[in-house]
A protein has these predicted regions:
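Bacterial N-terminal signal peptides
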Residues: 1-7
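Nuclease and nuclease-like effector domains acting on nucleic acids or nucleotide cofactors
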Residues: 8-144, 149-199
Length: 199
C-alpha cells in the first residue's frame, strides 16, 4: 500500500539525529486483508544520504542531466496489525521520500500545471484520505499538497506518487530550498547521515 504512494522512495530505518521538523499521525485505516494500518509521516527536509545521492546521480545521468542536488523530504512509516496464519501479527516499514534535483530545464506550461492541480486538488485529497485516513489539516484548514517533482521542472500535477501533504511551515521551507537544490554547488549535493532524525 505504501509503495504505491511514492515510487521514488526507498526503505529507511529510523534512528539518530534531531527530531523531525514536523510529524503527522494518521487515523487507523482498515486494510483489504481485515487488518489495520496507521500511517505516520516525518518531515524534513534533510540532506540525502550518500546512497541516495548515488542513486540520484544514476537517475539523472540516465536522463542525460547532471545531478545538482538531492533532498530527503519526508519519511512515511506504516504500522500494520492483523492476522497471519490465524495468529495475531504486526509489521511495518518506512519509505524515504526523496527528490533528485537533476538539471532539468524549466517547462513552458507551468500555468497549465498549476491550474490542473488547483482544479483537481479536492478530488485528489479525498482519494488520498480514503487510503491513508484523511488529508491532514490544522484548525479545519487543509495542509498544502507539495509536488515532490516540482511543477516548474515538469512534475505531474496530480500523479499519486508526486503529491505529499505538508504543513504550511514545512511547505514554506521546501519552496525556499528547492531553488537551492537546483543551483550548482549547494548544500544539497553534500551527503547527509543515513538516519537524519529520531522518532
Amino acid at each position: 500500500v505504501l509503495l504505491a504512494l511514492v515510487g521514488c522512495g526507498s526503505a529507511t530505518v529510523g534512528g539518530g539525529g534531531s527530531p523531525a521538523r514536523a510529524k503527522w499521525v494518521g487515523s487507523v485505516v482498515r486494510t483489504p486483508d481485515g487488518g489495520q494500518l496507521r500511517t505516520t509521516i516525518y518531515y524534513g527536509p534533510w540532506q540525502c544520504s550518500a546512497a541516495f545521492l548515488v542513486r540520484c546521480e544514476s537517475k539523472c545521468a540516465a536522463q542525460g542531466y547532471p545531478l545538482m542536488g538531492c533532498m530527503w523530504l519526508a519519511d512515511i512509516k506504516g504500522d500494520w496489525q492483523g492476522r497471519y496464519l490465524f495468529m495475531p501479527a504486526e509489521a511495518g516499514g518506512r519509505l524515504a521520500i526523496t527528490h533528485c534535483c537533476c538539471d532539468y530545464p524549466k517547462v513552458s506550461d507551468g500555468k497549465w500545471r498549476r491550474d490542473t492541480w488547483k482544479n483537481s486538488r479536492n478530488a485528489f485529497r479525498d482519494e488520498w484520505g480514503r487510503e491513508f485516513g484523511g488529508w491532514p489539516s490544522t484548525g479545519g484548514v487543509n495542509w498544502q499538497g507539495h509536488h515532490i517533482f516540482d511543477l516548474r521542472h515538469g512534475g505531474a500535477p496530480v500523479a499519486r506518487d508526486n503529491v505529499l501533504p505538508v504543513p504550511d511551515d514545512v511547505h514554506g521551507v521546501l519552496n525556499r530550498e528547492y531553488p537551492a537544490c537546483y543551483a550548482p554547488g549547494g548544500q544539497w549535493l553534500k551527503p547527509g547521515p543515513e538516519r537524519p532524525y529520531v522518532d
